[in-house]
Amino acid sequence: MKAQSIEDLMNQVSTANLQTSVAQLSGEQSATINGSTQTITSRVHSNNDLAADYIKERLETMPNLTVEFQNFNTTGKNVIATQLGQTNPDDIYIICAHYDSVTTYCADDNATGVAAVMEIARLLSNQCTDNTIVYALWDEEEIGLRGANYYAQQAADETNGNTRDNILGVINMDMIGYDGDAPGAAGDNDFDIDVRNIANSIAIKDDLISILNTYTFDLNEIVVNPGTTASDHSRFWNQGYSAVLVGESWETNDQTPDYHTSNDRVEDIDFQYMTELTKLVLAYTATKANLIAVDNTVIQTATDLTSNQATGTYQWINCDTNTPISGATNQSFTPSTNGNYAVEITNGGCTEISNCVNFSVLSNEEFQPNEIKVYPNPVKSIIKIDNFTESEIDITINTISGKVVKKTNSRKDYIEIEFDSTASGVYFVNIKSKTKASTYKIIKE
């Protein structure tokens, strides 16, 4: 996975994925479960093992997750997927939703929340984080918040030498798919943040609002304080943990009219609205878990490709065949043939892959100082090149990451290249003729 910004990840939230997951969880669409095509006809607590298997299997396809059932009575089982933090594994953020229902279908309550958790896990499991993320899907919410209650009690238990889990924040998504306007239509897009002044719950609310103001969303928050205790987040409040509920706006009476009935169907879900809420919780999670940056940029010269990540292990890849190159495991790589190349970098348990870089093999002979001169260095506005070779030369100027910013050719003995509008930084001027090639590092002030 390439290094991602939070905004990059938000833009990758897939409405189509959310639609498919909600349709499959609510039994409107079949899915492959336990190796065969099946339909989830029930998520009622007494008959929802197939739904649990579906969730667990989907999470198990994602990298960097440890997925398990947490059984808490003869029929109840939570699905817990843990993404261990690389720096602070004991600092935990939980993103959760209940997967059980009171009757058939129940698309909004709460296939929407489960689908959002799985979509966030799909995107963040490819990233490395400083802190631990737990993706939790609760059972038996509808008959007393039992699954979340068990987890929270176990996390807080300090008897018999146990250590209280350092859960820093919980976001519970319960019913995030209904907005009173026609699905996909412009409207108020109100949603509730239910919060109480327990532990640092108010700070979670503030962080969510900060994210709303930092990135672009089509959402309008309604802060409910004191918030409802009728969903799983409240069981974390009971144990003194920081938690909030994110969901459609009961506070403004803009919740599904089909609540707790089999009329709660996919056709009534506003997937644009649901996508926005999923993006919001993803951005919060990525921010608090703190994405670890592995530099996946590549420096390109006339003769070599070099990873800009100074530490780690490396594997160069032939992008044209999508295969690793045998023996190419150093920070720098000298291609022997023309082609497209990338490098996979692993550092501290985190793996990133660079963009593919097009490389043309050139002569190993370099220009002599009396043949080519590139100046001034540093440069402010004009790059000057003296060409004493009496040959045509190709000139390509790249950023440190390999991006081409200028490209030209000339056989003149004096060449000027406008550089005033180019951003400050380090650049490489690659000059080649039919028989020689050299790279010159310059600094733009």
Role assignments for model-derived ranges:
Residues 9, 18-26, 67-70, 78-82, ...:
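Structural recognition of the beta-strand scaffold that forms the well-ordered cores
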Residues 181-293:
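Active-site-adjacent substrate-binding region
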Residues 300-309, 382-386:
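A short beta-strand segment in extracellular, disulfide-stabilized domains
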Residues 2-46, 100, 254-265:
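N-terminal capping segment at the start of a domain
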Residues 101-200:
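Acidic/histidine-rich catalytic neighborhood of metal-dependent amide-processing enzymes
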Residues 20, 27-84:
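A non-catalytic alpha/beta surface segment that caps or lines the substrate-entry region
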Residues 313-321, 329, 333, 337-340, ...:
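C-terminal outer-membrane/trafficking sorting elements
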Residues 31-33, 72-75, 85-88, 99-104, ...:
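Solvent-exposed loop/turn segments at secondary-structure junctions
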